[in-house]
Amino acid sequence: MTDLCVRMCEMVRKIVISVVALLLSFSALAQSERLYLDTDFDFDFDNTEYSGSNLGASETLFGITLMPALRYEWGDKHSLSAGVNMQKMFGSARFLDDIDLIAYYQFRNENYGALAGLFRREKLIGRYSEAFFSNAWLVDNRVVQGLSLQYTDKNGFAELVVDWNGMYSAERREQFRIFFSGEGRFAKVMYAGATASMHHYANRADFCYNVVDDILINPYLGVAFKAFFDFDIRLGYLQSLQQDRLAGGGWQTPYGTELFFRMSRWGVFISNNFYIGDDLMPLYNSVGKEGIPYGADLYAGDPFYRTENAIYNRTGIGYERNFWKERIKVKAEFVLKTDGERVYTQQIISLGVNIAPKLYDKNNKRNK
């Protein structure tokens, strides 16, 4: 714990020095300057009861994440942020279970946006099925390491992201994801979109010839309307292309169809996600040169998309609402899952709080 505290103090010291240096370097160029203290707090509880299932393990993910960061803005479109991402899982013997750097540049105007560096995943705007990212994976991977290019208007959005989450070394595989999400609305209530991901799961420094390619494509068509309740109904197609260059055998091409339904009012919602098709994670139990299965290190999606019976259904009942100009977000959900043989349960509770007090405003000379 002493080593971790020393590491934390050293990291904080370096961040403060870096921020001060950046403030000094940009001050001469700024038309207007503002300094904020962004603080994001997340409380997460995700309990899965999958006893008897071959698809997932019964476990509880329970903890908090704290991300304080200084944000320096100049002009109306540019900002630079630096801080730390700290995670503590309840019951852990460690002082902190994870600590990492947050540092990124952000550009934004009415329609276009860009982020470069290490930034919160919540800044992404895309719509992604849980076949791409499960709730547990998102809780454990809150930081994007790379680049995001974004476009939004009144009729839709588009986003391209590069997330480099593995550096080539003796301890870790080199790996990165390039993913896209785009959607457009038409005929008042209709929308069409597509999501795609290319995951390059490469080698470590101590072995080679064990690259895995994992591609997933999801075009969809939906309708969203109000009739006392808010309704969202979406039909999508999932096509995967995967190959393990170590095992050989060429490309595997599992696919399936997904129907999503949600109705909500006053924050209370009922949702259902019905998937019928192939096992989208055929390499899940394949063993790489580390001597262990690829598992969740390769696949970020919900493991129930590994269905052995060509069917997976997820029904959720819960409450989800934002308060205080969306600075406080709460969600509680009870989930029923079935693989066509048995019914399993999951409980999700999350609380997110964001505050951003202004520390300095050049136009006002000081923050009153």
Task: Name each region found by the language model.
Residues 13-19:
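Sec-dependent signal peptide recognition
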Residues 102, 153, 157-165, 169-173, ...:
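Exposed, low-structure sequence patches enriched in small/polar residues
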Residues 25-27:
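N-terminal signal peptide c-region/cleavage motif recognized by signal peptidases
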Residues 50, 113-183, 198-200:
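Surface-exposed coil loops of outer-membrane beta-barrel proteins
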Residues 30-108, 333, 345-356, 360-368:
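Beta-barrel outer-membrane channel/assembly domains of diderm bacteria
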Residues 76, 136-140, 302-304:
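A short acidic, glycine-rich active-site loop
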